[in-house]
Structure formats: structure tokens, C-alpha cells
């Protein structure tokens, strides 16, 4: 009997957890990160303020909401040559240098990709593989590098070249 009560309690608790998670996630983008057998779902929202683009992130972890942000100056959005791989830490608000972006390509790199079907980022050349996929009404530019086998899918949107997926 105790075993059945315990199982019922767990089922009710898990259903309530799902309801709470739905209340937290409204209309921002939800990205899933998988690394070393771990999976994390991050909520991203983007806000422009003056000459800086802010990526605010959040995640529910251990029944607690954690959040932070990345700030990308306008110069970085135009001419950056590197992706930042700084891991999000709760409460951290990171101002990226003008050479780096997070989750976006710079306008220069995007133009290079569109005109030459290749671009350089993090001292690596990525070449266009295909444009078969779509997300949010945009084609995704599938690129890969021949050295490490990294693949990225980038939204074909010159105003907002969001990196949709990395493998």
C-alpha cells in the first residue's frame, strides 16, 4: 500500500512540475543543449538597447530559476570573427568583446557565407552544405567544417543570422 501511495505521489508531483514549467516558458525561443550525456533546455530572449544586443537566458534547474545574459556591442554584430563558448552561469551578465558573438553570426561573416558559400569563424572555415531545412519561416544554411566535422544550421536572415543548431 505504501508503495502505491508513493507512486501516486510521484505521478502527481511530476504532473505539477510540468504545469509549473509551462507557466515559466511563455513565448521566447527554447534551445536544447546536449553535451557529454547531459541535456539542458535554455530559454533565450533577445532585446536591443541603445547600441547593444542582449541575449537573456534562463533555465529551470533543481526547482529553481537560473538566469543571466550576454551583451553584444553593435561592433561585434557587424564584424566579429569568433563565437563565444562561455558557459552560462547563474547571475552572470557577460559583456562580450567586439571580436565575439553568442548564438549569432556577425554581419560580415553572414555576407561572406552568402557571397562565397563559405565563411571563417574561430579561425575555422565553414562551407555551405545545403539549404534544405527551415525554422521560423526561414531557410537554414547548413554549414560544416572539414577539419573537426562541426556542423551548424544558421537562419538565412541577414538582419538576424541566428545559429539554430550546432553539432
Label every model-predicted segment.
Residues 16-21:
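Sec/Tat signal peptide C-region and signal peptidase I cleavage site
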Amino acid at each position: 500500500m505504501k508503495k502505491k501511495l508513493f507512486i501516486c505521489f510521484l505521478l502527481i508531483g511530476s504532473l505539477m512540475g510540468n504545469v509549473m514549467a509551462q507557466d515559466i516558458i511563455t513565448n521566447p525561443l527554447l534551445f536544447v543543449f546536449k553535451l557529454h550525456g547531459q541535456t539542458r533546455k535554455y530559454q533565450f530572449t533577445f532585446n536591443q538597447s541603445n547600441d547593444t544586443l542582449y541575449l537573456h537566458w534562463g533555465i529551470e534547474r533543481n526547482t529553481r530559476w537560473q538566469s543571466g545574459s550576454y551583451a553584444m556591442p553593435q561592433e561585434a554584430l557587424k564584424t566579429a570573427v569568433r563565437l563565444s563558448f562561455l558557459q552560462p552561469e547563474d547571475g552572470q551578465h557577460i559583456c562580450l568583446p567586439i571580436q565575439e558573438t553568442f548564438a549569432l553570426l556577425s554581419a560580415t561573416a553572414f555576407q561572406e557565407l552568402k557571397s562565397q558559400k563559405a565563411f571563417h569563424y574561430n579561425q575555422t572555415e565553414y562551407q555551405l552544405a545545403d539549404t534544405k531545412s527551415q525554422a521560423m519561416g526561414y531557410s537554414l544554411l547548413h554549414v560544416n567544417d572539414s577539419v573537426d566535422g562541426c556542423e551548424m544550421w544558421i537562419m538565412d536572415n541577414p538582419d538576424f543570422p541566428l545559429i539554430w543548431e550546432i553539432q
